[in-house]
Amino acid sequence: MHRSRVMSMDPVLKQKIRRKLIQIAAFGFTNCHAGNFITGKLYNGKFKEFCTPGLNCYSCPAATVSCPIGSLLAVTGKADLKVSFYVWGFLLAIGAVLGRAVCGFLCPFGLIQDLLGAIPVRKFRLPKILTYVKYVVLGVFVVVVPTVLVIATGHAAPLYCKYICPAGMLEGAVPLLLTHEQLRDSAGTLFWVKLGILILVIAGCLFVRRLFCKVLCPLGAIYGLLNKVSLYHLTVDKSKCINCGKCSGCCPMDVDPVKHPRSAECIRCGACKAVCPKGAITIGFGDGKKKAS
């Protein structure tokens, strides 16, 4: 009886439940030490030597593994080429296999944005040109400026983490300040500036679905560049498509999968597949390259 109910479940609801369960599991695996939110301690065990595929602050009290962007900036700032190659290799390998499916299923900050986006207020679409800002952020704050500073001075601060990252504020700085009086007393101008950025991002995510993913995330920029070649991809069978527009209408990233099945913005969430009345959309590791254009 239970199995028959699951099989007959509305495909849109089924997709939402399945995806949310995966997101929650990924969030839980990445943040196993929830008790540290009370004590204010950080986990510093062996698992912190490894990166999570998604964006999750190293300084989050619950974090079990490291943030790939934070790790990349940390080793770049010390000119540690061996470890830097490891982090880049990890990101490129994950991106080549999954592309931005990481953003859709495995990123803790992505889950937070989805929860904010589920609040029933009017949603708006951003001009497409703003989606290119994240590539500027990646180039300037993660790659070019840190590299130039290391070459010139032998050291570089983790610029993106220090000056922009709202995930670091929400998951790391704010919880730590709540549990450490000394940190609260020493909070300066930079803290309040970053708190302002966090508030703007949170408010923006209420009205623009996945705002941070679209505009500011350097990790999404890296995976997005690999979306066109990733093994896990979206395919549209245009012989079945009736151009009803339901797929583009439900996309949280404002992608038209019929026109751009391998868009750098697509997070492979499966919403378009679930809503398609003709089953024209598939997502997986198949040989769908010939069907997708």
Task: Annotate each PLM feature.
Residues 1-254, 258, 264-293:
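Non-ligating segments of multi-cofactor redox enzymes
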